Amino acid sequence: MQDFVPNSSYTREELIACGNGELFGPGNAQLPVPNMLMLDRIAHISTTGGEYGKGEIIAELDIHKDLWFFGCHFPGDPVMPGCLGLDAMWQLVGFFLAWKGNPGRGRALGSGEVKFTGQILPTAKQVTYHIHLKRVIERKLIMGIADGRVAVDGKEIYFAKDLRVGLFSNTDTF
């Protein structure tokens, strides 16, 4: 495996490689693989910018009617589960921590307020995730705290405050 060199954007293939442990190296953060990978691309990632000036990520998921969750949630009334959008935001905070060069496996640690004000239907075209890093702790504890927004076809529909993700060198007792 080659040494990791951070990019400012990532393709679906690169995100799947991350899920297979090929991006950040063995024992380090991984994204889920399909079907739980809720991203098709990271359009932009930076240690600057965002609402707090501490970093941001913009990622996208292309929507099509044959996505796995539409067939079971709910029959006759298909909608993307809101928890999958929330999980995508946690996925992105963990990715950010590893992208900055921090070691360890990512685990979601919680969030503050979460609001759902809309839905993602199979007729939608694209979901956009926008993560605004508020704080990045890089000591013995490696943790990111961020606010996130989810939009469908340009309309904001979810908001999460204080998303927390940590990276751990040992998850045996987690």
UniProtKB/Swiss-Prot annotation:
Its EC number is 4.2.1.59, 5.3.3.14. This is 3-hydroxydecanoyl-[acyl-carrier-protein] dehydratase. GO terms for cellular component: cytoplasm. One of its GO terms (molecular function) is (3R)-hydroxyacyl-[acyl-carrier-protein] dehydratase activity. HAMAP family: FabA. PANTHER family: 3-HYDROXYACYL-[ACYL-CARRIER-PROTEIN] DEHYDRATASE, 3-HYDROXYDECANOYL-[ACYL-CARRIER-PROTEIN] DEHYDRATASE. One of its GO terms (biological process) is unsaturated fatty acid biosynthetic process. It catalyses: a (3R)-hydroxyacyl-[ACP] = a (2E)-enoyl-[ACP] + H2O; (3R)-hydroxydecanoyl-[ACP] = (2E)-decenoyl-[ACP] + H2O; (2E)-decenoyl-[ACP] = (3Z)-decenoyl-[ACP]. SUPFAM superfamilies: Thioesterase/thiol ester dehydrase-isomerase. It is found in: Cytoplasm. Homodimer. The active site is at H73. Belongs to the thioester dehydratase family. FabA subfamily. Keywords: Cytoplasm, Fatty acid biosynthesis, Fatty acid metabolism, Isomerase, Lipid biosynthesis, Lipid metabolism, Lyase. It comes from Teredinibacter turnerae (strain ATCC 39867 / T7901). Pathway: Lipid metabolism; fatty acid biosynthesis.
